[in-house]
C-alpha cells in the first residue's frame, strides 16, 4: 500500500483584497483583525460566501498572509474554496470582496451564491 501526502490547493489572496483589508484594519485601529471567509448553506444556488472580521484564529483554521494582513478560512469552508481567489472589486454595482471559485458549477448573478 502506498501513502501519498495531500497538499491542499491554495486559496489565493489577491493584492487588491489584501490592500483593502489593510485599509479597513488601519481604519479600525485594531491590528489583530483578520478577514474571515466562510461558506454556509443558503442563497439562490445552495451555498453562499460570507465575510467577517475576526480577532480569533482556531487551531484548525488556515491562515493566508499578504501585506501584513491575514485571511482566515475554517476547514469546512476550505474544502469548497480550495483553488479559489479572494479579490476586491470596485464597479458600477459598488465595491465588495468577491470569490472567483473554479469549483463552482453554477453561480448566482449576485456572485455570493454558488453550487458544486
Curated annotation (Swiss-Prot):
What are the binding positions for iron-sulfur cluster in this chain? 44, 108, 110
Subunit structure of this chain's protein: Homodimer.
Query: Origin organism of this chain?
Result: Stutzerimonas stutzeri (strain A1501)
Q: Which GO terms describe its cellular component?
A: cytosol
Q: What does this protein do?
A: Required for insertion of 4Fe-4S clusters for at least IspG.
Source superkingdom = Bacteria
* GO MF annotation list: 2 iron, 2 sulfur cluster binding; 4 iron, 4 sulfur cluster binding; iron ion binding
Per the entry, the cofactor note is: Binds 1 iron-sulfur cluster per subunit.
**Which Gene3D superfamilies does the entry mention?**
HesB-like domain
Q: Which UniProt keywords apply?
A: Iron, Iron-sulfur, Metal-binding
Cofactor entry: iron-sulfur cluster
Q: Which HAMAP family match?
A: Fe_S_insert_ErpA
Gene Ontology biological process terms from the UniProt entry? iron-sulfur cluster assembly
- One Pfam match: Fe-S_biosyn
- Indicate the family of this protein: Belongs to the HesB/IscA family.
Please give the name of this protein.
Iron-sulfur cluster insertion protein ErpA
Amino acid at each position: 500500500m502506498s501513502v501519498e501526502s495531500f497538499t491542499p490547493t491554495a486559496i489565493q489572496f489577491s493584492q487588491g483584497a489584501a490592500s483593502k483589508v489593510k485599509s479597513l484594519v488601519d481604519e479600525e485601529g485594531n491590528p489583530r483583525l483578520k478577514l474571515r471567509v466562510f461558506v454556509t448553506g443558503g442563497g439562490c444556488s445552495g451555498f453562499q460566501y460570507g465575510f467577517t472580521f475576526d480577532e480569533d484564529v482556531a487551531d484548525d483554521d488556515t491562515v493566508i498572509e499578504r501585506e501584513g494582513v491575514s485571511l482566515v478560512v475554517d476547514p469546512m469552508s476550505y474544502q469548497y474554496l480550495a483553488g479559489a481567489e479572494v479579490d476586491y472589486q470596485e464597479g458600477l454595482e459598488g465595491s465588495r470582496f468577491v470569490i472567483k471559485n473554479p469549483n463552482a458549477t453554477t453561480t448566482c448573478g449576485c456572485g455570493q451564491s454558488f453550487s458544486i
